[in-house]
Structures are given as structure tokens and as C-alpha cells.
Amino acid sequence: MKRIFFLLVICCYFASGAEKNARMAIGAEKSVHVVKKAGGEKAPTLLLMGGIQGDEPGGFNATDVFLMHYKILSGNVWVVPVLNRYAMLLNHRGIYGDLNRKFAYLNPKDPEYPLIQSIKGLVVDPQVQVIMHLHDGSGFYRPTYKSALLNPRRWGNSSIIDQDELPGVEFGHLKRLSLGITDHVNQFLLKPIHKYHVRNTHTARGDKEMEKALTYFAIKHKKAAFANEASKELSLAQRVYYHLLAIEGLMQEVGITYTKDFTLKPASIYRLINDPNLTLTMNENILLPLYGLRSQLKFFPFPKNTPINQISLQSQSYILGLLPRKNQIWLKYGNKLMTRLHPLYLDFDRSLKDIDIEVDGKITSAAPASILEVKRSFKILPKEGYRVNVIGFSLKNGGKKPNEVGVKIAYKNLDQRYSIDKRGKIYRIEIYKGDAFSGMVLVRFI
């Protein structure tokens, strides 16, 4: 069954109509999005978080893969896929400064103050017993100096704790648990240089920077907290590989059981991240594949007079977002730009349930936000009160508002420049009620 959820878009973008430039205001998020995965038996609750720095894709891609492909059998895992969504979409460490240095004291006037309060509230939730925070760090940590790449000042491939023990707290044996995590990871190293080590920052001894971090805030509030660092020297798939190993190691240490639907190898992770079956549904009436899109899609329907953060996005993935950029709206998948949408602002009509289309001689019913596979040709059947525009097809004497129904359309009749994909195989069927946009159906020639 396809997993769907609504994504928050973290920019306010007010469209005043196609004839005017839209007003845009970009601001920090006010709260985090939490996805709770619950098992069937009582066991601890792990709070798993990634993406506090927007330019560390290993963390938020790991949480995304975890949410899509892991099942919790006993215990609970609460997942924040990305803490700093705006910075992620811009591929920036932190637009308003380092979000992971705002947990000790923060001026209430700081743009990210509400977001920090939301994260703090989640950390101190009585149901949470243990916390893991995912980062991508430089080089490879070593307790003693080995080289410029392997030394105590590096962070990559390490398990971070603030102190050895947290007395009187469940799972307070931080060093012991961290050693359990690193022992688990080190059983499955891709190369010896990737070896994991425990790094104790001894924060309470006066590390002023680490005192401002999320994990130390958790420690001060009697929560066992760990950070996992994957090296920035590694590919994205390798970073996610080590993050997932660390997550599995911690779950085993605290008694959370799980299954997953793939073999934990970098090649498998690469395929999951770059899955050609990933899709996005916008406004409940537009469907797009994530991969293979043209670099730009022009005259793309958007509801006018609607803030962009009120546009619903549904996907199997949890790290999608829309990013306004001048007169375009960029579709982002984590840090990756999937396409640039050139918006056409329209009134939206919600009345259309489906439309009949003859595909290769057989009539089928298609709902908005669906895709049909075509071998030879298709023909849209008339529907009272609606008109149809097939993007890339020109009807003779069609006028400015064509109604391209009752016409058999073969692949050769379509202008490939107007396909949505680079291969020239997928085309938009747009349905209108008067001037209002009612929905889009895609046809893919196979």
C-alpha cells in the first residue's frame, strides 16, 4: 500500500493572479513534522531526527529511507525527517544561523525561536526515553592524530556523547550504549578507514559550543541522547548506510525490534533514494513522477490567491518541498532540484471525479492525479460541463480554449517538446470547467 502524507512547505508565497507578479515572503518554520512508527508491544520510544543543518543530506535521506522502508515490531520510533526544512531546500547550513547552536539561550525575537521551542517540546516529551540525532561530519574522527583526514578535530564516522553516564536515567549508560552502536557498525564496514569510534565531548566541563547543542539540552533534561556522524568524505548512499547501521545498533541496544524490506547495502540504498517510482501529488489533482522530468515545466497550473504553504503535497517521500525562486517554483527532493515549475495561476475547480478515456481501443475511467499507460493511441471522451486540453497536441481550428475530446491521438501526433519528461513519453491532459482548472491526467507511451 502506498504510504502518503502531507508535507509542509516552508515558504509563504502569495499568488495574486497570472497577470501580476506574486508577492513572496520566506520565513523560518514554526514547528517540526513528526511521524510516529509504533510497534505492537510495549518497549522504549526512540526520537530520531535528521537535517538540523540543511547541507547534510546523509541525515535527512536516512530518516526518509527509514520511514519508507522500516517497520517497527515492538517499541516506538518517532521520526522528524528534517528539522530545518527551509535550509535543506536551499542546501544551506542554516539561513538564520546554526540551528544546532540555539538550545541554551535564544532571543524570542529570533526567527527560529518557535521552531526551537517545538523541538524542545518534543525532546522533553515524557514518552521519549532515548534520542538519536543524525549529522554529516568532516573527515574521520580518531582519538589521536593520524593525518589531516583522521584526527581528533574531525567528526565523521563517530558516535557522539556529551558524557559517559547520566545517573538515574533509563538508558543513562551513554558510553556503554555508544560502544554498542559502534561495535555494531564496525561489523559491517565498507573499508577499514570507515571505522567508527565513540567521541565524548565532555560538554559539562566547559565546551561552550556543545552546551548550545540539541543533545546537551536533552542531557540536561534527563534524556539519553546520542549524535551519529557520517563522514562527508562518503557518497550519499554510503552516509545513509552508516546512519542506518547506527540506528539499528541503537534500537538493538534499547530493545526496539524491527524489519525492513531491503538488504542494507549502499547499492540498495542508492536504488531506494533514486527510485523511479517515486511520485508527487499536488493539490490532490496533479501527479508528477519525481525522476526524469524536464528541467523546466512551463504554464504549470497553481491555484491563485493561495499561499504556497497551503498547497497539499503527497508522496511516498518525506523530504519534498516547493521553493519559490523569482518567477519560478522549484520542486526539491531533499537538496536535489527535480524541476523548475513556471506557474500559471488559475482558479481551481474541485468538482471533477473522473473522466473517460479510450486507451488502445478500451475505455477506462481516470481520476485527476493519475497516469495511464498507452501503447498506440488514446481518445478523451466528452464530459458535459468540462473541456480538455492535451498539452503538446494541436487541434486544427481549436482556438484559444480548445476542447480536444473525441479525437484519437497517437504518439506521432504529439510535439515531444511539450512532454513533461526528458524521454518525450509522458504528456499532460488538463481538464477545465470554464476557465477553472479541474485536474490533470498523465498519459505515458510505452
Predicted segments with their positions:
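Structured catalytic-domain cores with a bias toward divalent-metal coordination
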Residues: 2, 16-446
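Sec-dependent N-terminal signal peptides
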Residues: 4-12
